[in-house]
C-alpha cells in the first residue's frame, strides 16, 4: 500500500509463477499505465522473446473502444495465433490479489476441463452489485450455471474473472463469438455454453480486495492499515513488484504526529496524520491535520489544512487553510 498500482498485483502474481509472456489489453486513459509499466523490467519481463506486450485500443479495428472481453481478445488474435504456449491465463486488473496461477493450471490439467475459473465464496461487494458473475457448482467442481448481476444476498460463489484454458480453445471461442457479433466472454460464451463446455471452478481462499469504484478504492486502501490484511496480501515469499523510484526515507519533523497510517518513501510530515495511506512523496505541512485519507503520489498539503475522508490524485496541491471533508 502506498506504492502499488492495481496492475502490479496480477502482473506480480504471474511473474512469481514463472509466466514471462504477458499481453495487457488496455481500454482508455492508459498513458500513465504505460509510463508505469515501461519495459516490464521490474517484473523481469524486459525480454527479447516474450516479455510484456501492451496492446492499445483500436489496434486493428479502429472503430470504437472495446465493449467487452471478446472484442479485446479479438484485437490480439494474431498475437495469440503466433504464440507457442499451450495454455493461456486471463485476469482483469481490478482486484488486488496475490494469486497462484500454477495451482489454477494444475487443477485445470487434473480435471480435464475446457475452462477453469477462479472464484471466491463471499458476499457480493457493494461496488459489484451491478457488475458480477456468480457460479453454481456441482459436487465434482463443474460449473452448472453462471448468473449475471446476481442480486441475492448472503455468501455466493463470486467469479474472480480469472481463467485458464488452452490457447487453441480460446482462439476458437473468440472467433466463433466474433462471427456472431458477441461481446462478453462470461455472458455470451461461458453462460450460454455451460452445458456444452466443461467448465470447472477452483475456490480461492486468500485475501482479495475488489476495487470497483472510488468508494471501494478508498475502503480497500484503509483496510490495509490492519496488519492482518497487509500480511495476507503481501505474504513472505510472494512479493509484489512495482516501478522503482529512488526516494529518501520518510522524514518526520519535530512536532509531527502519525497514528495508524501507512506511509511510502519520500514523504515529509510536519503536521498530523491519522488512519491514512500516503503514497510516495506526499508532503504534509505544519499545522495540517489529515485523517482517514488516501493521498496519492506527490500530493502537497499546505499549512493549516484539514482533510477528512479525502482521496487525492497524484501531484495535487491543497492550498493553505482549506477544509475538505467527505464521508466514509
For every predicted segment, state its role.
Residues 1-222:
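Unchanged
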Residues 168, 176-328:
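Left-handed beta-helix
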Amino acid at each position: 500500500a502506498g506504492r502499488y498500482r492495481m496492475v502490479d498485483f496480477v502482473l506480480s502474481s504471474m511473474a512469481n509463477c514463472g509466466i514471462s509472456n504477458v499481453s495487457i489489453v488496455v481500454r482508455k486513459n492508459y498513458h500513465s499505465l504505460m509510463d508505469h509499466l515501461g519495459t516490464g523490467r521490474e517484473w523481469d519481463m524486459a525480454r527479447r522473446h516474450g516479455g510484456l506486450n501492451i496492446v492499445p485500443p483500436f489496434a486493428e479495428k479502429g472503430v470504437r473502444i472495446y465493449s467487452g472481453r471478446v472484442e479485446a481478445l479479438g484485437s490480439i488474435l494474431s498475437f495469440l495465433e503466433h504464440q507457442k504456449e499451450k495454455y493461456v491465463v486471463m485476469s482483469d486488473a481490478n482486484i488486488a490479489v496475490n494469486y497462484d496461477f500454477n495451482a489454477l493450471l494444475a487443477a485445470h490439467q487434473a480435471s480435464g476441463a475446457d475452462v477453469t475459473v477462479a472464484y471466491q465464496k463471499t458476499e457480493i461487494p457493494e461496488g459489484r452489485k451491478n457488475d458480477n458473475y456468480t457460479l453454481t457448482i456441482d459436487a465434482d467442481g463443474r460449473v452448472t450455471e453462471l448468473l449475471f448481476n446476481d442480486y441475492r444476498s448472503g455468501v455466493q460463489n463470486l467469479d474472480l474473472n480469472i481463467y485458464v484454458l488452452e490457447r487453441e480453445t480460446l482462439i476458437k471461442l473468440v472467433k466463433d463469438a466474433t462471427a456472431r457479433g458477441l461481446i462478453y466472454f462470461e455472458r455470451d460464451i461461458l453462460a450460454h455454453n455451460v452445458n456444452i463446455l466443461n467448465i470447472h471452478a477452483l475456490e480461492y481462499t486468500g485475501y482479495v480486495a475488489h476495487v470497483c469504484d472510488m468508494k471501494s478504492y478508498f475502503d480497500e486502501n484503509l483496510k490495509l492499515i490492519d496488519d492482518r490484511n497487509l500480511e495476507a496480501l503481501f505474504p513472505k515469499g510472494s512479493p509484489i513488484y512495482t516501478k522503482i523510484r529512488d526516494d529518501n526515507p520518510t522524514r518526520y519533523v519535530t512536532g509531527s504526529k502519525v497514528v495508524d497510517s501507512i506511509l511510502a518513501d519520500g514523504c515529509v510530515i510536519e503536521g498530523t496524520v491519522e488512519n491514512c495511506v500516503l503514497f510516495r512523496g506526499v508532503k504534509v505541512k505544519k499545522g495540517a491535520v489529515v485523517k482517514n485519507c488516501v493521498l496519492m503520489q506527490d500530493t502537497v498539503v499546505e499549512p493549516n489544512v484539514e482533510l477528512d475522508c479525502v482521496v487525492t490524485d497524484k501531484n495535487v496541491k491543497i492550498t493553505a487553510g482549506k477544509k475538505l471533508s467527505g464521508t466514509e
